[in-house]
Design a protein with these regions (language model features):
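A general structural signal for short secondary-structure junctions and capping/turn motifs
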Residues: 2-3, 54-57, 113-117, 388
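Bacterial Sec-dependent N-terminal signal peptides
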Residues: 1-25
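Zymogen propeptides/activation segments of proteases
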Residues: 23-95, 99, 355-358, 383, ...
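Catalytic micro-motifs at enzyme active sites that drive phosphoryl/nucleotidyl and oxygen chemistry
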Residues: 52-54, 113, 135-136, 224
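Acidic/His/Gly-enriched intrinsically disordered linker/tail segments
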Residues: 136-139, 155-160, 175-246, 251-290
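Juxtacatalytic substrate-recognition/specificity segment
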Residues: 60-184, 188-192, 202-203
Length: 435
């Protein structure tokens, strides 16, 4: 009898243990796997007391969201921290994550068939902290991830998530072994802003300070460290011209010995002169945001770019420090004295003609914010003659500083901020004779 009772008790204990294991396993949903990073391999995700736990987790088809113990089980009821609101709208977060994921994967093509993201969910780690910095990247060079605190994700649009998830997708290229992505650099920040701008076309309004800052610094070289968060406009131009997937292709093609401009030229077999033509076309369009995706919504920003000029006896020169650098640009408004009149200007380069080249031309803008463009010019000493459209209300001269003959990125990869001990970026000085 005792032996029979012992067997029954062992059976019941085994059943309880088995059910407990099944209960723990049921916390992990079906579908894509949840990757456990190396740094957490010793942690017990089944234990609700652990820093990261299946008991404080939410999943979608493509994401797993973990949150720290301090939030409690329900993010909508998270206790304040030092008097600060720590609540998170989890439903909105999950919804936005999937919306952004679909664009970055299916339209922008940052991941290709065979990606590790087909096996694993991307990871979002919510820190119970007042630290305002958010990060996007990957775990163990396996799967894209991002780390964020509540104060960055309490708005409905979740611009921060759109930006940081952009970094997660950029990192996934390295995780999947499909490209080197130059080994890093400011292009990552510019691209995340471009990705954000695609999923939220009102980014330039919501975070208008970026546009305001760029309007003070657009003379600086392309991908200057001061502008990488402010100016995704060249990337918008490239995607308009080459297709939405071109930026991901650029990341895959970029080698550690290159910079993005060199990679782009290589991808499309462009000479420096041809690339300079494209950069002028891009910047002349930027006067009215003449890019199909945002043209209508951005008419309100038409004609806002302006370069400080010194004007003396009909000779205009950029104010000290404002001459364009390599693939930076200037914008100068030319007075219209009579509608439909013929405008005559003379351009004179004032830099070393063996090294400096220019692209320049005119942009006429009507009251509705529509633009008409003159032919672009590249002469070092050139005369401009242009008959104004009858409906033109404003006229802008646009000039781009370009390398001559050969493009050499300035500094350690053109897209990195320059160190204090490095020589300054070259300026492309010029004179504009206004008649």
């Amino acid at each position: 009898m005792k032996r029979a009772m012992r067997k029954i008790m062992l059976f019941m204990l085994s059943a309880i243990t088995y059910c407990g294991v099944m209960a723990q396993e049921s916390l992990v949903p079906e579908g894509k796997e949840i990757y456990i990073p190396n740094e957490f391999r010793e942690d017990d995700f089944n234990n609700p007391e652990s820093k990261w736990s299946y008991h404080r987790m939410a999943t979608t088809e493509n994401f797993v969201v973990f949150w720290e113990k301090g939030f409690g089980a329900d993010l909508s009821k998270a206790p304040d921290l030092e008097g600060r609101n720590m609540k998170v709208d989890l439903d909105n977060l999950l919804k936005r994550l999937e919306e952004f994921y679909a664009v970055y994967r299916d339209k922008m093509k940052f991941v290709l068939p065979g990606s590790k993201s087909e096996r694993y969910r991307m990871m979002v780690m919510l820190n119970y902290s007042l630290e305002g910095t958010a990060y996007g990247g990957s775990y163990d060079n396996v799967i894209g991830a991002l780390w964020v605190s509540p104060n960055r994700i309490q708005d409905k649009k979740l611009n921060c998530i759109a930006h940081e998830l952009g970094h997660s997708f950029q990192s996934q290229i390295s995780c999947d072994g499909t490209g080197q992505s130059w080994g890093g650099g400011g292009i990552f920040e510019m691209t995340s802003q471009w990705m954000l701008w695609n999923v939220n076309p009102e980014w330039t309004t919501d975070e208008n300070y970026h546009l305001q800052d760029f309007k003070k610094k657009f003379h600086l070289r392309f991908l200057h460290g001061s502008n990488i968060y402010h100016s995704p406009y060249v990337l918008e131009y490239w995607s308009m011209k080459r297709g939405l997937g071109v930026i991901a292709d650029l990341f895959r093609a970029g080698r550690r010995s290159e910079d993005p401009a060199s990679t782009y030229m290589k991808m499309f077999d462009l000479t420096v002169d041809q690339f300079s033509d494209e950069m002028y076309d891009c910047y002349s369009r930027l006067i009215t945001f003449d890019f199909p995706r945002v043209k209508e919504s951005h008419r309100k920003f038409a004609g806002e770019f302006s370069t400080p000029m010194d004007k003396e006896s009909g000779v205009w020169t950029p104010a000290e420090g404002f001459a364009p650098e390599i693939y930076g640009f200037n914008v100068v408004e030319i007075p219209i004295e009579k509608k439909g009149a013929k405008i005559k200007l003379q351009f004179k380069g004032d830099s070393d003609p063996e090294k400096a080249a220019f692209r320049y031309g005119l942009v006429a803008v009507n009251a509705a914010g529509d633009a008409e463009y003159s032919a672009s010019m590249s002469e070092y000493d050139g005369k401009i003659s242009y008959k104004l459209p009858k409906d033109a209300e404003r006229l802008f001269f646009v000039v781009v500083g370009c390398p001559k003959g050969e493009y050499k990125p300035y500094g350690r990869n053109m897209f990195r901020p320059r160190g204090e001990n490095q020589e300054p970026d070259p300026k492309f000085d010029y004179k504009l004779l206004v008649k």
